[in-house]
Amino acid sequence: MRFLIGALLTLQTLVQASSMSSMPNSYPVPEAPAEGGFRSVVYFVNWAIYGRGHNPQDLKADQFTHILYAFANIRPSGEVYLSDTWADTDKHYPGDKWDEPGNNVYGCIKQMYLLKKNNRNLKTLLSIGGWTYSPNFKTPASTEEGRKKFADTSLKLMKDLGFDGIDIDWEYPEDEKQANDFVLLLKACREALDAYSAKHPNGKKFLLTIASPAGPQNYNKLKLAEMDKYLDFWNLMAYDFSGSWDKVSGHMSNVFPSTTKPESTPFSSDKAVKDYIKAGVPANKIVLGMPLYGRAFASTDGIGTSFNGVGGGSWENGVWDYKDMPQQGAQVTELEDIAASYSYDKNKRYLISYDTVKIAGKKAEYITKNGMGGGMWWESSSDKTGNESLVGTVVNGLGGTGKLEQRENELSYPESVYDNLKNGMPS
């Protein structure tokens, strides 16, 4: 996700992506989109309930087909566990009772279940890992015992907490051994999920997805075709292409490389998508990740030029929520040929790379023209509302909510340890 900084320190050393400056492309005839329609996927982070004041109830649930609840952590044994039990299961929201009999779940988990109950097309997945916790994958993934523990405990959390599947965010396997271990980890999870599905009263298939890299130095190490056998879809992290680790300011989520300023586009979504397809991943299983934030460059004369520092940010230096954009005094530039945009304040010499509504619309065009599986966003707290919503813009560009995947969620969790969830959260 957004926690890619360490891995991206080496990005500027890569060979520039091949030039392609217009929306038409040289794909083979695209496959049909995701069965039943496009996927609309968003990450909800459990720490958003604190300073950001963003809670599950704030989600515009009818715009999404999948919410990825981030993040669970991993012990050396392979055990998957919740990272913040107060936020996840304990916090009492308005309407939650303190004297309710039984062993009950509250917090964001209860609110996620209620969203599903009121929006039967909405699926939720427990996302495991993320940038901060990714170092914890290596040890358990390396042994059969560790992989089994990972699969069994992630499945138990899914059954206890009312999720529709598991999302794995390992950033990133570093060599061939870890890449092979990742395949085996996915296999173990898929087998555990399918075994539970087979004995589940409703026979529902539970989902397995991953957050996948858009940088060649990371995805070229992966066994993409082998991984694909076990995955329902891929959430391609097509952002953080440029940032504080670079020598010049750049676009951080462009679709195509720039022919006029190639130094500003060290990577591109289009190259990653093409490489995944070439490796054997169907286009309709690739969900294009898009940012709901911008990356900043201070003391710069413009895009593709040197900078010094990144300035402030909404919650961390150099990173601004989309809802805080554009800043007063800044002029917005939209480059439709590469599907990228940025704001620049020439007096402050401050540049922020982020997606505008127009560029979000271009990305929706790219998804539809190339038979992709839909769109994904990091992360839900940062969008605007109404006509300025990037999520809403893309969903409308895909044809509206009626064109989204229609696949009913699961509400029956007879093996949950929580009485209220096992009973369907009666009012």
Swiss-Prot record:
Gene3D superfamilies membership: 3.10.50.10, Glycosidases
Protein name (Swiss-Prot/TrEMBL): Endochitinase 1
Broad EC category: hydrolase
Signal sequence segment: 1-17
Family: Belongs to the glycosyl hydrolase 18 family. Chitinase class V subfamily.
Entry keywords, A to Z: Carbohydrate metabolism, Chitin degradation, Chitin-binding, Glycoprotein, Glycosidase, Hydrolase, Polysaccharide degradation, Signal
Organism: Coccidioides immitis (strain RS)
Glycosylation sites: N387
EC number, as in UniProt: 3.2.1.14
Gene Ontology molecular function, alphabetical: chitin binding; endochitinase activity
Catalytically driven reaction(s): Random endo-hydrolysis of N-acetyl-beta-D-glucosaminide (1->4)-beta-linkages in chitin and chitodextrins
Residues at the active site: E171
InterPro entries (UniProt xref): Chitinase_II/V-like_cat, Chitinase_insertion_sf, Glyco_hydro18_cat, Glyco_hydro_18_chit_AS, Glycoside_hydrolase_SF, Glycosyl_Hydrlase_18
One term under GO cellular component: extracellular region
Residue ranges constituting the GH18 domain according to the UniProt record: 38-401
Chain residues that bind chitin: G102, N103, G129, G130, W131, T132, Y172, M237, A238, Y239, D240, W378
GO biological process, alphabetically ordered: chitin catabolic process; polysaccharide catabolic process
SMART domains, per database record: Glyco_18
